[in-house]
Amino acid sequence: MKQHRENLPIILASSSPARIELLNRIKIIPSQIIPADIDETPNLRELPAPLAIRLAYEKAIKVASQVEESAIIIAADTVAAVGRRILPKATTYEEVKNCIKMVSGRRHRVYTGLCIIKTENDQLTVKQKIVQTIVKFKKLSDEEINFYCSLDEGRGKAGGCKISGYAEAFISFISGSYSNVMGLPLFETANALTSLGFKVY
């Protein structure tokens, strides 16, 4: 899993274990993990997709401003929504429960904003992408909802759901990138890196 010597170092602007794991799947090991501490509050009437891409860009730019050496910075932000309603990154049992009730028996969308910045010779090259995945949960009983919430795996996740966990047992339909729902669309990430001269293969 060694990077090509001629590649610039990769800096991941996130401490998310899922994003680290996803990069490792395509044989990329970040040389640094620098979480970007930004205000993730949506603007008034801000829609889910614009929110995701804005936050990803703000994360990438913040980390780029802290890095002196040439590098490639990868940042992402994942937003779940039912229609135009943005679901929170649930932090409490009640928030997880409310989110799961919202998506029970219906389709919802997961957006990941991807922003990759190449900083070299005091110049920034920015690549941005918004990726959407449609996910449908079966109609859940109160018992199933309570059981899922008791697992505590949805805390800190967009929409209160960890797709790579027990929630997979509830998903009846998915259209689009699975890795996107986990937090980093790998196809788009690899393409963006390649366009910046990074040898993924």
Swiss-Prot record:
CDD domains: Maf
Active site: D77
Domain of life: Bacteria
Enzyme class, UniProt record, top EC level: hydrolase
Signal peptide: none
One GO cellular component term noted in the UniProt record for this chain: cytoplasm
UniProt keyword Cell cycle, yes or no: no
The keyword Acetylation is annotated on this UniProt entry: no
Cofactor(s) required for function per UniProt: a divalent metal cation
GO biological process: nucleotide metabolic process
Subcellular location(s) per record: Cytoplasm
EC code: 3.6.1.9
Cited Pfam families: Maf (PF02545)
One function term, GO molecular function aspect: nucleoside triphosphate diphosphatase activity
Annotated catalysed reactions: a ribonucleoside 5'-triphosphate + H2O = a ribonucleoside 5'-phosphate + diphosphate + H(+); a 2'-deoxyribonucleoside 5'-triphosphate + H2O = a 2'-deoxyribonucleoside 5'-phosphate + diphosphate + H(+)
InterPro entries: ITPase-like_fam, Maf-like
Keyword annotations from UniProtKB, A to Z: Cytoplasm, Hydrolase, Nucleotide metabolism
Family in the record: Belongs to the Maf family.
Function: Nucleoside triphosphate pyrophosphatase. May have a dual role in cell division arrest and in preventing the incorporation of modified nucleotides into cellular nucleic acids.
NCBIfam families in the cross-refs: maf (TIGR00172)
Protein name: Nucleoside triphosphate pyrophosphatase
Organism: Rickettsia akari (strain Hartford)
